[in-house]
A protein has these predicted regions:
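A short, polar/charged loop-to-alpha-helix boundary motif
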Residues: 5-24
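Short, basic/aromatic recognition patches
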Residues: 1
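Flexible, glycine/charged-enriched surface loops at secondary-structure junctions
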Residues: 26-34, 88
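C-terminal binding/interaction regions
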Residues: 36-125
Length: 125
């Protein structure tokens, strides 16, 4: 399972949790160091002007790849990424287009409820 956190989207959270299970890693283990995530979030907020900077699934997987260089547990999780292909996944909301594309690339059999994640659909910029 996964849900939006203050750092990442539900699809990203769910994927990390699935990788932990497939890799036999403890759920409480941090696979991506905050020192990797914080600059990305700061960039999205301060430079891109995002008022709700959440890391997408693609950004989290890139961060996991970077972390795998120095974190053996992240490396183990990354090596199990191909095992996600064919997994059944269901979202109670429509995923963002970016997360939806990455889920398809990973091979998820994904279904979604016909509900948007937010009522704030107009960016206004």
């Amino acid at each position: 399972t996964g849900r939006n956190t203050n750092l990442m989207t539900a699809a990203a959270s769910c994927t990390l949790n699935a990788l932990k299970v497939l890799s036999g890693l403890d759920d409480a283990m941090l696979l991506i160091a905050p020192v990797v995530l914080e600059p990305i979030l700061r960039l999205k907020k301060d430079i891109y002007g995002s008022d709700k900077p959440l890391l997408s699934l693609e950004e989290v997987l890139i961060s996991l790849s970077i972390s795998a260089v120095t974190n053996t547990m992240a490396d183990i999780a990354l090596k199990n990424l191909d095992r996600l292909s064919g997994c059944e996944a269901h979202s109670t909301v429509i995923l963002s287009p970016g997360d939806d594309i990455v889920c398809k690339k990973l091979g998820y059999n994904l279904t979604c409820e016909p509900a948007f994640a937010s009522n704030d659909l107009y960016d206004g910029k």
